[in-house]
Amino acid sequence: MAPHNCDRELIDLIHNFFLRSTLLICSSKLNKNQHLLEEIQKFDSDLNEKPDLPKTINEWFHDENERNLPPLVIETLLDLKKLSPNHFVTLRDDDGNVWNVCKGTKKSEIVLERWLIELDNTSAAFQSYRGTIDSTGEIRKQIVLLARYLVTLIQILPSNELEENLTKNSTNLILSLKRKVIDGSKPILSKGRIGLSKPIISTYSNVINERNIPPHLEQRKITPVYTPLGLLRISVSFRHDCRFEVNQSTDSSDNVASNTTNIHQHLEPLHNKNYTNTSLSISPHSHIALASSSERNSIGKKDLNSKPIHPFKTGSVGSCTINQSQAMIRTTSNPSVIATLRAQRSRNDSISCQSQLEDIQLESTSVGSGSKYSSSFGRIRRHSSVKSSENVEKPIRLVKQSNAPTDDLLDFVKMMDEKQELRITKCNISSNNADISNSILRFQKLKSSNEILSEDLSMSVSLEGVNASMHRRSSVSHSPIPSVSPPVQYPSIPSRLSKTNLQEQDTFKTAVVSRRNSVEKSKINISQPKTTGRIENELVDKPLFNEEHESKGEELLASGIIGPSFKRSTSPHSIESVSSLISKTKIAFQQPSYYSHPTTAAVPAYAKLHRPSVLSTDVLSEDQNKKVVQDLNNNKDEDDELLFFMSDMNLSKI
C-alpha cells in the first residue's frame, strides 16, 4: 500500500488525469482544441490553478476524496429527443442490410459507448505489484503516453465516423451525439432508452463469444499506470454498428395505409354477409339460420355474370344455393324423410355449384380437390366427388330446375312415409346377415375336427404296413408286445370275432376301407356314441413275470377309441407310446385283414422284456402323460374287467 505521507503532488497528478481524460473523451470533432494535448503534456506546470469544473465531475476533486476516488463513467449517446412520430430510426449493418430500431418518440437515446476511468487500489494486480516505486516525474511521463494512446483510440471508434456523417448531412441535424458523466459506484439504468447491452441486429444472438462479452459489443483497454495510490485504468465498450439513419414517412404511404384500412373495413361486412348465408348449409339442424322466402327467391334469381365474393374458393359451400325443399327437410323431424332426401339434397348442391364454375375458374384451383370433404357438419356428401366431373354445358337450365318448387317431390316423400314395409326389409336383411355369420362360424369350428380326422387317416395308412414286421420281431424275441396298428376313431367295430363267422370279418374289412375314403361319414360318426367291445379269446393260464405290467399292456391293446383331446405325436415302436392310447371308452383292437383268426398254444412265456431303443419320452409332453394317468385312475374299475394274459401267438397267413 501507499504510505500515509504521500506527496501532494501525486494526488494532484491523479486528479489532473481524471480531468484531462474526461475532456478528451467529451470533446467533439467540431470543437477540438489542440491545447488539450498541450495541457496533458504540461503536467509539470503549476497545478494549483484549477479550471472551473462542471457539477457532474466536481465531486472527484474534493479534498475528502483524495485517496478513494469513485469510478468515473462517460457514455456516448445518440440523442433521439428531436424526432417526431413520423420519423423512424434504422440501422445499416456491414452487408448493407437495414434493421428497424425504433419509431420516433418511443426512445429518447441510444447508448453507443461507455468509458470507465478508475483508480484501482483493491485489485490483485495492484496488491501483488513488486516493482520499483517510480518518482512523480516518471508517473507523469506515463500519463502523457496514455493520453496520446487515448486520443488515437477515440479517433478510430465507430461513433467518430457517425459524428462526421451527421455534420456533413444537414438533413440529419435532428440526430446528435452527446456525452454524459455518471458516477460508476451507482447502478446505471436504461429506462426509456436503448441500453448498451441490448442488441439491435438479431443475428448477433446466435454468435458465441468466449470473452463473456455480448457479441454486438467490443472492448478496448489501455495499459494501466502504476502509482503508489493505485492503478490508473481507462477502458471502453462500444457497439460494432453505428450507422444509424432517420427516415420520414411520406404522405403517399399514409394514403396507402388509409386506403388499405378502408378496404379492410369495406370487406368486413361483405365477409360477414357471406358467412351468414353459408351458415344455412353449415348447420343443417339449426332453426335460427333459415332465411325468409323473399331472400331465397332473390338468391335463386341472382345474375350468373356477377362475381360475388365467396369465402370458400372451391364453391362447395359458399356458392351453393338452398332451395325450399332443403329448408322443409330441416324443419321436419321425421328421420326417415331426412334419410330419403339426403342424397337428393347432395345432388342439388353439386348441380347448383357447377352453374358457377365459369366465375370460379379465375380464383379457384379445382373443384374435384375440394369435393372430397363434407361441406357441412353432421352429414356426409356421398355424391359430391362424382357430380363434380359432370358436364356443365347447360348451367342455367339446371339452376332453374333446382330452384323451382318441387311439389312432386313432396308427394313422393309423403308416399314414402306411409309405407311401413321398408322397415321390415331392414329387419330381414339383419336376420339374413346373422344367419350368414352363424354359418361362417360353424364352418370355422369344423376346421379343427377336419384336421384331427385327416391325421387319423394318414396315421392309419402309414402304420398299417408296420404291423407284420412288428409281429415277426415280437415272435422271434419272445416279446409280449403284440403287433397292433394304432387305433383309429372308428364308430362301431364288431366286438366279437369268431372262428366260424368269417362273414363278420369281411364286413369289418369293408368298414375300415370305407372309413379311410370317406371324410364326411367319419365326421358324423365321431359325434355318435362309441360302443365298446371285448375280445373273448380262449387263453391258457401260464405263470408270467411282472403280471401287473403285462395287464396294463394288454389293457392298452383293448382300448380302441381315443379321446378328442389326444394328439398323435407318439412313436409306434415304443411301449411307452402305447400307454398314452388309453381312454375311457374301449373297443377291440383291429385285426389285420390278411391274417387268419388268432390261435392259442401252450407255449411257456419268457420273463425277459425287450425294450425298444428309442423311447417316446422325448416325444410325449408332460401334459399328455398326466391326462393318460388321470384316465387310468378314473377307469380303474372298468380296466379290471379287461385284464388278460397274453402269450406268443402263432398266426398263419390266409
Curated annotation (Swiss-Prot):
Keyword Transport among UniProt keywords: yes
Superkingdom in the source lineage: Eukaryota
Localization, UniProt: Cytoplasm; Preautophagosomal structure
InterPro entries: ATG13, Atg13_N, HORMA_dom_sf
GO annotation, cellular component aspect: Atg1/ULK1 kinase complex; cytosol; PAS complex; phagophore assembly site; vacuole-isolation membrane contact site
GO biological process: cellular response to nitrogen starvation; Cvt vesicle assembly; mitophagy; piecemeal microautophagy of the nucleus; positive regulation of autophagy; protein localization to phagophore assembly site; protein targeting to vacuole involved in autophagy; regulation of cellular localization
Keyword list, A-Z: Autophagy, Cytoplasm, Protein transport, Transport
Record bears the keyword Flavoprotein: no
GO molecular function per UniProt: armadillo repeat domain binding; lipid binding; protein kinase regulator activity
Oligomer and partners: Interacts with ATG1 to form the ATG1-ATG13 kinase complex.
Similarity-based family: Belongs to the ATG13 family. Fungi subfamily.
Function: Activates the ATG1 kinase in a nutritional condition dependent manner through the TOR pathway, leading to autophagy. Also involved in cytoplasm to vacuole transport (Cvt) and more specifically in Cvt vesicle formation. Seems to play a role in the switching machinery regulating the conversion between the Cvt pathway and autophagy. Finally, ATG13 is also required for glycogen storage during stationary phase.
Protein name per the record: Autophagy-related protein 13
